[in-house]
C-alpha cells in the first residue's frame, strides 16, 4: 500500500515504514503527527483519488530528527561595474518515519 500526500507545498509518495525528509515541522522529536491532505491512496487492488483530498483517510508519522541542509551560495555579479554580492542560505528540514497509512476504502456492491 502506498499513498501520496501534501506537506509543505510539496507532494510525497510514501509507504509504511519509510523515512522521508519534509519541510520543517514545529513539533518536538518523538511526536506523532497526522497528515490529512491525502491526494491518492492505493492498497494494491484499488486506487482512490481525491477531489482534491480523500476524506477520512490519514497518515500517521513520528518525527525522528530536525536538521539543516548544506549551505548554498547565491552570487550576483556584474563585470566591469565593480559589483559583487554574495549571500548564503540553509534550509531547515524534518525527518519523519511513516508508521501507518489509514485507508477507509470499502468496496460497494452494485447489486450484481
Curated annotation (Swiss-Prot):
Keyword presence, rRNA-binding: yes
GO cellular component, as recorded: cytoplasm; ribonucleoprotein complex; ribosome
Keyword set, alphabetical order: Ribonucleoprotein, Ribosomal protein, RNA-binding, rRNA-binding
Biological-process GO terms, alphabetical: translation
A molecular function (GO) term: rRNA binding
Presence of keyword rRNA-binding: yes
Lineage top rank: taxon: Bacteria
InterPro entries xref list: bL21-like, bL21-like_sf, Ribosomal_bL21, Ribosomal_bL21_CS
Subunit relationships: Part of the 50S ribosomal subunit. Contacts protein L20.
Family: Belongs to the bacterial ribosomal protein bL21 family.
Protein task: This protein binds to 23S rRNA in the presence of protein L20.
The name this protein goes by in its record: Large ribosomal subunit protein bL21
Organism, as annotated: Buchnera aphidicola subsp. Baizongia pistaciae (strain Bp)
Lineage, opening ranks: Bacteria, Pseudomonadati, Pseudomonadota, Gammaproteobacteria, Enterobacterales
Chain's gene name: rplU
